Structures are given as structure tokens and as C-alpha cells.
């Protein structure tokens, strides 16, 4: 990603020249010029778009997980909690879920992702409850049988942080 206010063709030509000297080349299919103030673009799993702050009027980059990245993590959660995995002990399922979700969250946590992480947390809770309900043949939706204390306290499910790190105090983040 290269940002510039103008002369994009000249900058792109310069980049190609420098890479050519290093005997490297740009992939033409993946290389594109975008006006980030008007349209979004995806880069390394993030969707980046310029937004205006309604209070100050200043433009800032809004960096969120891409739709493809969210779809992928939800697919992984579904795969780990599907009916085929009912024979596997719940401790193993929770361990595998924690590894996948902790890794994904660690990568995407530093963008403007509070809304996406809140949605993912609700999705994860619901999938784990559904898995446990099917495993133990419960007919209810599972909120009473498997409350938050059970999911996070007893089972040890990873609690997805739903607020961005810069909105928390240093003590709350575990930093000094």
C-alpha cells in the first residue's frame, strides 16, 4: 500500500523501476490504484476506507476485518462445532476453538473492529451453546443450562475482547 495525494501513475512507474533493478516485478492482477477517500480496498484481510469524523470533520482511516475474513472465521467455528464433532470431548472442542479464535482476534484486534468482535462473540457463544445442547440432548436454547459463567468460567472458553485497546485505561488492558 502506497499513499499519495497525486501523481499516482508516476509513483507506480517509480516503484516498478526500483523493483526492476532488484529483479522483482509487481503482480499486475493484484496491483490497482484506488482513491481511498471515495472507495474501500482490501489488504491483508482488512478493509480500509477513509471516513470523516462527524464531530471534527477530519478524515481518518477506518480499518476493519474484511467480509471474507469474517466469513472464514465463522466457517472455522461452524466446522469445529458441527454435528460430526459431537463424539469429541467438549474440552477438546473448546481448546481447538480457543486456539482459532485467539489467533484470529489477536490479528484483527488493533483495527476499528469493536462491532465485528461483538458480533463474532455472540456468534461463538451461540454455536458453543448449540453444540452443548446437541451433545447433551437439551431441548431449550441453552441460555439457562449454559450461562456465560459456565461457558467462560467452567469450560474456559476464550472471551473475545469487544473494545479496542486504545479505548481502555492502561490498567484495564493489563499494561502498566
Model region roles, listed by residue range:
Residues 1-176:
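Non-catalytic terminal/accessory segments
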Amino acid at each position: 500500500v502506497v499513499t499519495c495525494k497525486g501523481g499516482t501513475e508516476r509513483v507506480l512507474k517509480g516503484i516498478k523501476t526500483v523493483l526492476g533493478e532488484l529483479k522483482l516485478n509487481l503482480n499486475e492482477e493484484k496491483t490497482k490504484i484506488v482513491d481511498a477517500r471515495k472507495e474501500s480496498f482490501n489488504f491483508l484481510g482488512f478493509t480500509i476506507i477513509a471516513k470523516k469524523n462527524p464531530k471534527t470533520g477530519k478524515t481518518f482511516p477506518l480499518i476493519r476485518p474484511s467480509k471474507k475474513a469474517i466469513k472464514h472465521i465463522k466457517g472455522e467455528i461452524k466446522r469445529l462445532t458441527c454435528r460430526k464433532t459431537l463424539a469429541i470431548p467438549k474440552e477438546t472442542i473448546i481448546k481447538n476453538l480457543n486456539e482459532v479464535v485467539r489467533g484470529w482476534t489477536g490479528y484483527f484486534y488493533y483495527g476499528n473492529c469493536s462491532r465485528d468482535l461483538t458480533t463474532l462473540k455472540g456468534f461463538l457463544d451461540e454455536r458453543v451453546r448449540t453444540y452443548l445442547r446437541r451433545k447433551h440432548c437439551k431441548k431449550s436454547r441453552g441460555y439457562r443450562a449454559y450461562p456465560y459463567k459456565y461457558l467462560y468460567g467452567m469450560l474456559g472458553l476464550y472471551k473475545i475482547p469487544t473494545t479496542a485497546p486504545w479505548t481502555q485505561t492502561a490498567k484495564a488492558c493489563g499494561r502498566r
